Amino acid sequence: MKTEKTIWQKSREELFQELSSTPEGLTGAEAARRLEHYGPNELQEGGRKSGLRIFLEQFADFLVIILILAAVVSAILGDVESMAVILAVITMNAILGTVQTVKATASLDSLKQMSAPTAKVVRDGQVVQLPGREVTVGDVVVLEAGDSICADGRLLECASLKCAESALTGESLPVEKDLADIDGDVPLGDRKNMVFSGCFVTYGRARFLVTSTGMHTEMGRIAALLKSTEEKKTPLQVSLDQFGRKLSIGILVICALLFAVSVFLRGENVMNAFLFAVALAVAAIPEALSSIVTIVLSFGTQKMAREHAIIRKLQAVEGLGSVSVICSDKTGTLTQNKMTVKKLCTGGQIIPADGADFSRPEQRELLRAALLCSDATVNESGEVGDPTETALVRLGESYGFDEAEARGKYPRLAELPFDSDRKLMSTVHQLPDGLTMLTKGAVDVMLDRTRLSPEEKAEIERMNEELSQQGLRVLAFGKRMLTAPAIGLEDENDLQFLGLIAMMDPPREESKAAVGECIAAGIRPIMITGDHKVTASAIAKEIGILTPGTEAVEGAVIESMSDEELREFVPRVSVYARVSPEHKIRIVRAWQERGNLVAMTGDGVNDAPALKQADIGVAMGITGTEVAKDAAGMVLTDDNFATIVQAVKNGRNVYANIKKAIQFLLSGNTAGILTVLYASLAGLPVPFAAVHLLFINLLTDSLPAIALGLEPHSDAVMQEKPRPRSEGILTKPFLLSVGTEGLVIALATIIAFHIGLASGGAAVASTMAFATLCLSRLFHGFNCKSGRPVLFTRAFWNNKFLLGAFAVGALLLVAVLLIPPLEPLFQVAELSVGLVGCIVGLAFGSMVVIQVLKAIRSMGKK
């Protein structure tokens, strides 16, 4: 494969010879051989981890390592049962985490398969349609308007070809292509005799010789650069890391102190003292925490996938929930990405498109010119062509005019294709009133070529300005009678003015409500677009992004600003127009330096660096390139801004539910710690066996914690402000609640322990403490549903998963206490009916006390 530098400089004949190809393309056998040699024509996903590696990474968590060490030491000291239970639980967690990670990757892969491109390729002299991944070096590919370009290559044939290369170069306008050889080294955007993978054809037809595929294309080179970029941690990852470090240090200190007191002050056996310390560690470490968080996040991703948002990484769910700034593209995300005619101007009047009367000759003639002087087609299989031209065709269809019928009746006899220099397009047709040239183009250019008087031109310029201020794109139409069909550029003069047609890409119906929901939630929506400022401002005002007190600026304004100046400037701006990829990165970084979490949307290759810079990169699933999707944390399957807002709502609810689950686990474990410490300081027997605490933490705790993670989502979260960037899970109010609730449950457990000691000795007391702690924690699940009391309210019953978890946990406890073969395994003693009644009363009483405390706290806030 030749280097990309030489390709645009060589003649087509040289390239055919070097690549051993012909204008008739490759044979099927040769194509198969080359595909084997070069590999499939697709971007490699750098760093994709194997299932085994993902599984092994589940054991790298610090809390898991502590548990593994505890299991090993337990085995050394002869406590094989505890070791087996601990290792079984750790393995279950690892399997669960692996499955969820693989499922998330599979969801994205399915999206890629849905949007996989195809190509028309010349094989054995015949044009066949193949999956894009099967195209190889030396193939000849056929292009038409609307086609996605599947590989890099040199043009062989070219008829008025224009390609949208904004995804690769950032150039907002389609690039005109030609066949001329190019001398010297030129930048990517000036290689007019080449086409590039990831771009698409907006106009014309062509054939090209494939010179590079897959990772050897220009897009592939950018994708390779992105592989090594370090990913940011989301707030949840940071919070859990902080939590893990603090908890681990605390556990080690407490266990060491307890071991020292037991051995050196109380003279206990070293092995017994160690087992006691291990029991405390087991009580303190929420073994199910990582799996609970993973499960809740995975449920969040599945819910969001059903709502058109595919999460590439589980933690991005929570990250979206704490976003405070959303930088969104305009076209296709806030708008419909579908140009629509809004107004016409004929006879000196501006007429709404839905109020036109095409029985009037001047309006009918304007519409006919719009249909005939256009290359777009609209049919059952979709729309092909420039968006402005498809809008003209749809206008005709809405009034019963069929473009195919019109073009069949008045065929095109000659044409002057549009180009960006003259900003005009002309076609020749035999119309009822004679041979006619129809011309459309920019208003200012057209006016200079018409027969209008200065006064008439001034009036049309006034109407054009009025329409432009409304964010409309305006085209002018004219005609000229001919004596012969052959035309040249000099004929585009002395035109009879027919009128103006104004169109726009209208906002999505749901955009305004979504923007309003963002603002109510304390999230700042920002529009960043390559479009003109007037157009962007009109859309932004209509949907509520551009409000009094904020402004719209063009990228050139921030070009000369330092990073410090831009950081102070960004709060004033709601719309950025005509921006470059570098501008996007600077805008995102400026908001981040102000302490904000930023979500950024993008679809092109040139958006990928900004998507990486953002805290949450959001790629478009329909129009987005594979490089953009790979750089993003979330992919929208409907390219809709409202989906981002819904994802934010889901993210906030998921975070709130995770916090409930963590509060449930930590307060329950706190109760276990306090009970063990009390027994140690009071010189009492060990209240729990390690297997008791593992049973509680992993069986009767896991289900309620998962159920709390599935609490019904609330719209109320969108009335709250985003959490500060630096706020972790372990806030002072959160820790106070955990400590208070843990103390209440511990008191109930200690009372049960003393009742057991008085009734039947250490074995009965241990069983009483175990059963009371277990049942109290099951009841405690209802306490964690809300910061307000829920007892005797509908909210107590609205989570069927929590009700089911309570029932299952209670049945498991009953089974352990009543099934004789389980008694030695779980180290429990037989209890009388009276003692069982004490357990139920103390456990339910702990819930009532906590509910009363919540009521008092709620009244205090009022």
Task: Place the predicted regions along the sequence by residue.
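Conserved cytosolic headpiece of P-type ATPases
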Residues: M1-Q719, I729-L730, L743, F770, ...
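Helix-coil boundary and interhelical linker segments in multi-pass alpha-helical membrane proteins
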Residues: S680-A689, F753-A765
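Generic alpha-helical transmembrane segments
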Residues: T700, I745, T767-G781
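Membrane-water interface at loop-to-transmembrane-helix junctions
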Residues: P724-L743, A763-T767
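A C-terminal functional module that forms or caps the active site or interfaces directly
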Residues: C784
